[in-house]
Amino acid sequence: MCSQEGEGYSLLKEYANGFMVSQVLFAACELGVFELLAEALEPLDSAAVSSHLGSSPQGTELLLNTCVSLKLLQADVRGGKAVYANTELASTYLVRGSPRSQRDMLLYAGRTAYVCWRHLAEAVREGRNQYLKAFGIPSEELFSAIYRSEDERLQFMQGLQDVWRLEGATVLAAFDLSPFPLICDLGGGSGALAKACVSLYPGCRAIVFDIPGVVQIAKRHFSASEDERISFHEGDFFKDALPEADLYILARVLHDWTDAKCSHLLQRVYRACRTGGGILVIESLLDTDGRGPLTTLLYSLNMLVQTEGRERTPAEYRALLGPAGFRDVRCRRTGGTYDAVLARK
């Protein structure tokens, strides 16, 4: 009977089971499956994995076999037993320490974003984030959930560092930024984008501006603080004086906030910006009609359940930047996750 239902029914099941796939990925990362197999001298059977992880034999075997089906692990038979090893995909993106690892961002997604997504229907009804239901944190305290402990803050910062390690150079090369000798990355976190900037544009210097707790962690844990071309400045970009610069980068910042708060921040940036300078907004752009790409629409729903903001179309960014005083607004799609919007003072 199922085979007679056609592609529509199969697609529906694929959508409905999508959360299970995500949880397999999150759980395997949380348990340390990929690290264990990366460190092992040879492929391990499920009993050995279970013993090392302190997990149940039955659950471990089920998880490992599901990861094989998802092409995260590969299985061979030795001595009558199945043994498991990481695939290239897992070795590249899911093992801590890999130059291209995305493990920390996946852990954040599983521990924080996924919990909020359980309340998507309520978010749609109410039009606000779901931190109160998910974590008992008032909805206006946006980053209290993400930064609810120093470990969570460090993990989120590491996750963003990993994202920018893969995607930073592409989006920073969307426009030639060499005419801007001093660049200020507002909400710059670990300094990953600043590091990419001075690597791509060696004649530039960069300032990383973020709240004190983030700056202190960045200096302790991330290598950008060791580059003499990069400095750190503590402050709240909504309240405190902004360092003077030729170019301000707002990467994954405006999508957190309402239009009113974005306008307020952009006006502050315009006043601080040197004459002839500019602003680079890095976000995932919606299509002109607002009905795609799918990934950006999902990100926008993520903003609904977690922040005050949303993803926007190029026209909507122009409508924010123009009244703040910026001119010559140009939008460029990179073909990657994040796109670039450059405007001048």
UniProtKB/Swiss-Prot annotation:
Expressed in the pineal gland (at protein level). Not detectable in retina, nor in liver. It comes from Bos taurus (Bovine). Its EC number is 2.1.1.4. The active site is at H255 (proton donor/acceptor). PANTHER family: O-METHYLTRANSFERASE CICE (PTHR43712:SF2), PUTATIVE (AFU_ORTHOLOGUE AFUA_4G14580)-RELATED (PTHR43712). Catalyzes the transfer of a methyl group onto N-acetylserotonin, producing melatonin (N-acetyl-5-methoxytryptamine). Pathway: Aromatic compound metabolism; melatonin biosynthesis; melatonin from serotonin: step 1/2. Keywords: Lipid metabolism, Melatonin biosynthesis, Methyltransferase, S-adenosyl-L-methionine, Transferase. The lineage of its organism: Eukaryota, Metazoa, Chordata, Craniata, Vertebrata. It is an enzyme of class 2 (transferase). Homodimer. The keyword Nucleotide-binding does not apply. It catalyses: N-acetylserotonin + S-adenosyl-L-methionine = melatonin + S-adenosyl-L-homocysteine + H(+). The keyword S-adenosyl-L-methionine applies. S-adenosyl-L-methionine binds at Y147, W164, D210, G235, D236, F237, R252. The gene is ASMT. GO terms for molecular function: acetylserotonin O-methyltransferase activity; protein dimerization activity. This is Acetylserotonin O-methyltransferase.
